[in-house]
From Swiss-Prot:
This is Phosphoribosylformylglycinamidine cyclo-ligase. Coiled coil: none annotated. One of its GO terms (cellular component) is cytosol. The lineage of its organism: Archaea, Methanobacteriati, Methanobacteriota, Thermococci, Thermococcales. It comes from Pyrococcus abyssi (strain GE5 / Orsay). Gene3D superfamilies: PurM-like C-terminal domain, PurM-like, N-terminal domain.
Amino acid sequence: MLTYAQAGVDEEKTARALREIIRTARETFKLRKGKVGEPGDIGHYAALLDFGNFYLAMTTDGVGTKVLVAEAVGKFDTIGIDMIAMNVNDLLCVGAEPLALVDYFAVKEPNEEVFKQVAKGLYKGAEEAGVAIVGGETAVMPDLINGYDLAGTAIGIVEKGKVITGERIRPGDSVIGISSSGIHSNGLTLARKLLIPKYGLDYEYEGRKLWEWLLEPTRIYVRPILELINSVEVHGLAHITGGGLLNLKRLTNYGFELEMPPIEGIFKLIHENGVPLDEMFRVFNMGVGFIVVVPQEEKEEALEILSRHYKSYELGNVTRELGKIKVKNYGITL
């Protein structure tokens, strides 16, 4: 049995270590008090800066150790998509339309072919998300970096009065999940350390090599979510990233009662190799990359809209059991 913490990613330890940085960051808010760009609070998927009639939303994220898989097989043309996806999907969670992005690419040494492949993925991701890449930083640091690191910072815009934070979520609301493309960009450290030493990257599983499962690009949800929020009342939006279903606790203190889709593909292989079910749902997206919460009366229209883009599921409902996320069909409470 291997857990995420045993693989080297202890999220509780990280949260404790971050407390001082978050406290200090909040102290800087007073520097913009009463000025254009005054920030809201820290903690949601994206920060909100006050620009009068609208908020500028801002977020930052990276691809993580998925880059190590790309490096191992010499295939870098999809990690740019991952970086765009990780950022724009977070912007969507406050109801913002993504506008632009800057990238940060740290390397041991410049390689023209690698740069060309990364650029290809960045363009494809930007095209899907409808954003402009307006700048960036390439850092060549042979004494610090042993391979590659790719991250970015994105901005979006949302009108005041249209911000979605989860505060309107109520017991009885419907919970809808949009399918993921696979592992996305979270839990790769656990997946790599569990599977690669045992099988190797060329291992065939259900018709695909292991590296193909691991490098499948993160799905970009901009089109379905923007269509949704312009069509129905939406109470909450959650990008299911690191922490799995625990991300729902970022939206509300209310509980959730869900039935998740069957465990398939890469998640099935990981579970079969000893990762317990509760850990699976705490680490991976488990086939659902994005979750929306809508009033019951909006459920059918929401499902119709989302299903036009990607396979979507009616997962369950919001409950009055504070802080409890129940996955009924697997007998798990998170």
